[in-house]
DNA sequence: GTTAGCACTCCTCGGCCAAGAGTGCTAAAG
DNA sequence: CTTTAGCACTCTTGGCCGAGGAGTGCTAAC
């Protein structure tokens, strides 16, 4: 991967990629001659060499050069200026997260919005998910004669709600007592452990009422669903802005992007991969085996608290993407979100029990 | 609006519109001659009359006819067959809602998905919102030494969560006691009433601790925000499928739709209008004053429990939309959702107090 | 009132050509 | 051996033209 390239050849490659990212037009030898202080013929020779090396290509004889996947890859790994976001931008982002730090379920909206604006492409964010969710607390609230609202709080802070049928005339006091008992029974338990509590009735003293069993089973089911992330949704933002990029001149491109985002590729393939990796993942075009990604690049990072709970944040854009800026943005925002989550319950890791 | 049109002329108009909806191609006199049992010349005469009446138009001399806004309007109000969904479809939809009836926050996802598939256009759904939200219940859950999770349940069943800073070493028992006191203080109260509780400290006996005031203020703020629907989001689905329609041949169309959905037109203009109206609203093309809607039609219906809590469900598509099917779908799904919400807490309306 | 016939209009699409962009090669210069 | 000027060559792009075709509007006959 790390090819032998002399200094000037690297400069040419870098210049081609930067200009192509900037203008979306194949770059001609003439364009670089001036800034490199050599003639266009010399640049052409260098370009031809880079093309032999598989880093550049061109669309037809009389067209300028543009990078291949390998070219972009080399750029990202060896050539690119790793510019961080300006401190001003960092402050703004921090500030916005600070504003809503208490509203957990707005995080993903904010993260997607900020990332889309900062990286100037479409952003994707998944909500944080526990590897193994642990029970924290339930609450039972009477809604009317026959219905009860079950609010389930999981350890990493996510809240699930559900309604359950109840015996008529169950009072709120009774419900609170029941909730209290279940909270003790299920304290810190995993989904499996809770399912067992409902099934191995005999060990419970006094035995559980049928309503209590129903509640416990509902809790177990909700936690299992949560772990299998049946409900996991990808939130995205910035699609509209991305459509102004020239690569989206025809509607099929738009359809491709939408079907990557909403049609499963993201969820089935990219997100799991990002969850399983450390650091920022950069996937350029056809490097990924999924054919529908051929013309797109994806930059993803896990965020969260190590080994405890994690989500994914990142961007999706055309292969011709502002890699330096996008990578910095993804890295920075993943960091901010991880810090915030650390504040919320990272400490618990250090002080083992509550 | 209700023009004088003889029977045959109505038949011609209806046939033109149905065929145009079907094929997206201007319809020629020849196309209708067979099915109407007259010659193409006769059809042409009728078409010319309909054009004079402002119900049809054509793009250039040698092109077939297509409906104007007024033509579609006449069709929707006087000509269209009001076919209900098949009982099989109805059962399927009912069944799907039944499956997730307990998971309130999945309703809008399901509704949008089902509607998009049934009506075969893009669907939009807003979550149910109370006209004036009333306090139901809070719960305070210790997350770690310095942070507390506040879970707020509103009367119509929605749940808000928020984290608050707390004195170190506050125990869960203390928090539960505080929650209990606040639950009593705020019982069934409105946002304003709760804000007053926090401000008119003097009336409280014993006086509220600073943490209690913080909690109450947070509750009041959350409820106010909820009423002003600062956070109200429109969920949509089916965009990808709609892009296969021939009107989306160029990307500007896609941008237009996205900016209607996400750029404010929906939220600022259409949703409030639908919330304020009874029944199914049909807005055809330029009938609405917003220029960006010129080429689109919108069908919206309020759903919910009358005077208590309501949301909006509907579809957005090209003007050439399958009105009969879309209108039936929107009406039916709004009905199903209203029924479900009625089950949840509509009864309360009949039995005045809890 | 209906319809056959026909002239007329306007769009669509393919082919063609000129202009332009940019390369690759060659041969000369450094 | 590297660099560069020069030039022929290739391929795209955009405009233009003209044939073909679709569908109308009108007129005159039924």
Curated annotation (Swiss-Prot), chains A, B:
GO terms for molecular function: DNA binding. Keywords: Repressor, Stress response, Transcription, Transcription regulation. Negative regulator of class I heat shock genes (grpE-dnaK-dnaJ and groELS operons). Prevents heat-shock induction of these operons. Pfam families: HrcA, HTH_11. It comes from Herpetosiphon aurantiacus (strain ATCC 23779 / DSM 785 / 114-95). The keyword GTP-binding does not apply. Belongs to the HrcA family. HAMAP family: HrcA. InterPro entries: GAF-like_dom_sf, HrcA, HrcA_C, HTH_11, WH-like_DNA-bd_sf, WH_DNA-bd_sf, WHTH_transcript_rep_HrcA_IDD. Coiled coil: none annotated. The keyword GTP-binding does not apply. GO terms for biological process: negative regulation of DNA-templated transcription. This is Heat-inducible transcription repressor HrcA.
